[in-house]
A protein has these predicted regions:
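Nucleic-acid substrate recognition interfaces
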Residues: 1-381
Length: 381
């Protein structure tokens, strides 16, 4: 089904691209759906899932148009001009999505029943904590993952921010979290992620070398399995990390979590080759998405804010995190930042405090904070 969904996506995308390139017109989802109802790929995908595939293609095109509009106004914010939605690989797969009118959730035994029209009579064990929206099958290299999409109510987070925690993301220290309630900062060790990536890179290089020598190929099903296992291990590590952070916030009555983010982190990385490889292979966006939905589910206000100039300005000297104050040479040795008065502070803790200061300038005072600047290092499993 995912193969037919891919074929439908490419066929419809071809029609849209040709119409746009030759005539400058865009065909709406409704017209495309009407036109493709008689096509073989539409029938093989089944009408309801085919609708979902065409809707997703329509969404991708509308994102392209929004991107072009934003690029014309502020081209400096982009790495280049947005490109037309691409075709999927000929031998690839695309998610196959079934809407809720073709699926029934049975809360008494925690299963989802998919219409017999699509597959044999079978109940899938799952967890659905709200109104079922969609069931989708996602291709993941050597296997398929079934995802349950549901809608649930979330608590209101519009209240005043009083108890605040701020996070600075890194490599050796995956997460450095500070707060304004007088508790020691927390550092979540990033060595677990580095270990997963190092093992994956070593195994991948060995298998690719043997594959090239024996069969003259660059990729195989075995490499798909290795890559999927690496993805699952990292996803689990990120879930454990986000789970620990949110639970800590709940236990300490934190009502607002601020996370430092740079949209051009990986494009502009200037680290040495080894450090850069570790940095590029850490899926920070996965962690941010998990933190966002987990915070929203428990009523914690979640804020992402750009972190520029936070690593080279001094919290202890009460400097504003702006370009005029930026001086990264004050990071005198690995992991330490020296203030103007000679006090030493963990550089990631300094960055985290400056991130908090960017969003909430009066959330925390520099005076008397030295007593709670020694971070507690945590390892998640």
């Amino acid at each position: 089904m995912c193969f037919h969904s891919k074929n439908l996506y490419n066929e419809a995308n071809y029609v849209l691209r040709q119409e746009f390139i030759k005539n400058g017109n865009y065909i709406s989802y409704y017209d495309m759906n009407k036109e493709f109802k008689t096509h073989e790929n539409y029938k093989l995908t089944f009408s309801q899932p085919a609708n979902c595939t065409l809707r997703l293609l329509d969404k991708n095109w509308k994102s392209y148009f929004r991107g072009i509009k934003a690029w014309k106004k502020n081209p400096e914010k982009f790495l280049g001009m947005p490109k037309l939605p691409k075709y999927l690989k000929k031998d690839g797969r695309f998610p196959w999505m079934i809407p809720n009118n073709q699926v029934r959730y049975k809360p008494e035994n925690g299963t989802v029943h998919i219409s017999n029209r699509y597959m044999n009579d079978y109940d899938w064990k799952c967890r659905c904590l709200g109104r079922l929206i969609q069931v989708r099958f996602i291709p993941r290299g050597s296997c398929y993952v079934m995802e349950i999409v549901y809608e649930t109510e979330i608590p209101d987070t519009n209240g005043e921010s009083k108890n605040i925690a701020a996070i600075d993301l890194g490599v050796d220290n995956l997460v450095t979290m500070t707060n304004n309630i007088g508790l020691n900062p927390i550092i979540i060790n990033g060595n677990g992620i580095k270990s997963i990536n190092q093992y994956y890179n070593k195994r991948l290089a060995k298998e690719k070398s043997l594959l090239k020598i024996r069969h003259g190929k660059d990729w195989s099903r075995k490499l798909d399995v290795i890559t999927f296992k690496r993805f699952q291990r990292i996803k689990n590590y990120m879930h454990n990390t986000s789970h620990y952070i949110v639970n800590w916030c709940i236990e300490n009555n934190i009502d607002t979590l601020v996370v430092g983010k740079n949209d051009e982190w990986k494009q502009e990385s200037t680290m040495c080759k080894k450090s850069n490889q570790n940095f590029i292979m850490i899926p920070y966006q996965m962690l941010l998405q998990q933190l966002k939905y987990k915070c929203e589910n428990v009523g914690i206000k979640y804020i992402e804010y750009e972190e520029t100039y936070t690593s080279g300005t001094s919290f202890l000297d009460e400097e504003e995190p702006i370009k005029q104050n930026y001086d990264k040479s004050r990071r005198i040795q690995r992991g330490l930042f020296k203030s103007g008065t000679g006090l030493l502070i963990n550089s990631d803790v300094n960055g985290s405090l400056q991130i908090m200061k960017k969003v909430f300038p009066n959330a925390i005072s520099r005076y008397g904070i030295e007593a709670v600047l020694t971070p507690v290092v945590i390892s998640v499993v």
